[in-house]
Amino acid sequence: MAGNYHSFQNPIPRYQNYNFGSSSSNHQHEHDGLVVVVEDQQQEESMMVKEQDRLLPIANVGRIMKNILPANAKVSKEAKETMQECVSEFISFVTGEASDKCHKEKRKTVNGDDICWAMANLGFDDYAAQLKKYLHRYRVLEGEKPNHHGKGGPKSSPDN
């Protein structure tokens, strides 16, 4: 939905067991205002979203940045890390919008058409138009049929 911004930067993990007791051996963590008490180290480690699972590989981000810049340009570690955060957040933002659409349509698979729709719905119309052209060319080259039924997902997909 245009205008509704989601933040996926630090998603709250789904906790199975809350223990709001005050045992001194417990560890307390705060996630967006929610204090969660963890009973042991193993449970604590399983709840944390690993940074490498949340972010694109920094080497890939750096390589893309270097390809855009003049050959003699340098990119600082801070610039790579900042861009890594930005692009990872952007991907989560667009994918979340596409996923919401699929959920409303009772589909499990997010496809390229859903991503194009999400980009346009979020106000990135120019990018969505170019992405649609690219997706069409990709499908032609791969021998796939373009999606023209308007729902955003292929009719023959087994999980739709």
Curated annotation (Swiss-Prot):
Gene3D superfamilies: Histone, subunit A. One of its GO terms (cellular component) is CCAAT-binding factor complex. Pfam families: CBFD_NFYB_HMF. Residues 83-94 are annotated as: Subunit association domain (SAD). Component of the NF-Y/HAP transcription factor complex. The NF-Y complex stimulates the transcription of various genes by recognizing and binding to a CCAAT motif in promoters. It comes from Arabidopsis thaliana. Expressed in flowers and siliques. Keywords: Activator, DNA-binding, Nucleus, Transcription, Transcription regulation. The keyword Ubl conjugation does not apply. Belongs to the NFYB/HAP3 subunit family. InterPro entries: CBFA_NFYB_domain (IPR003958), Histone-fold (IPR009072), Transc_fact_NFYB/HAP3 (IPR027113), Transcrpt_fac_NFYB/HAP3_CS (IPR003956). The keyword Nuclease does not apply. SUPFAM superfamilies: Histone-fold. Heterotrimeric transcription factor composed of three components, NF-YA, NF-YB and NF-YC. NF-YB and NF-YC must interact and dimerize for NF-YA association and DNA binding. Residues 56-62 bind DNA. One of its GO terms (molecular function) is sequence-specific DNA binding. This is Nuclear transcription factor Y subunit B-5. It is found in: Nucleus.
